[in-house]
Structure formats: C-alpha cells, structure tokens
Amino acid sequence: MQNDIKIKERAYEFAIKIIKLTKKLPKDTGGFVLGRQLIKSGTSIGANVEEATGAFSKDDFIFKMNIALKEARETNYWLRLIRDAGMLKNPEVEDILNESKNIKNILSAIVKTSKERR
C-alpha cells in the first residue's frame, strides 16, 4: 500500500515535469508531434495509477497498473527519441528520463507483487 501512495505522488509530479519539458521543445513539426505524444503518455501514467487506487478488484487493480506501466514504457521511448534527436539539451532530458525509468521500475514491482498475491 505504501508503494501505491508513493507511485501516485511520483507519477503526478512526473506529469508536471513532462508538461514543463514539452514547452521547451522546438516550435516545429517534430517538436509539436513528439511533444503531443509525450504529454499523452507522460500524463496518462498518473491517471491510470489514480484509477487503479479505486479499482473494484485485485484484477482490475493489476490491469490499471499494467496500463500505467505501458504508458511509462512509451514515455521512456519518446524521451529517448527527443534526447537522441538533439531536440533538447542532454542534461535537461536525462533527469526526467531517469525519473521515467524509476517510475517504470516501481510500477513493474507493484504489478509483479500484486500478481503473486492474487
């Protein structure tokens, strides 16, 4: 349960960082398209974690957390693409990319533990 609260707060703070980061992307087609994808996946993590906390059953909880995990993986992909394409300075992206990896690891652990306790 403590992990659930921790991930809920981290995912919310992460979404705010994602929103702020996308404002710094280039104002061109690439920046717009990748920014939109990043906003969608990066803010969806917390939304799905929030839904999971109100799940009707253990299976529903696992399902929602799995969706959050998939969104975290997608977010990680977009961040790597932005970094490797040189759209933003490396240190700026690296910090949020590390947080993305941490969130992904926490979600993986929650899903694994929840499945084992099913």
Where are these regions (language model features)?
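Short, C-terminally biased terminal segments at protein or domain edges
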Residues: 1-118
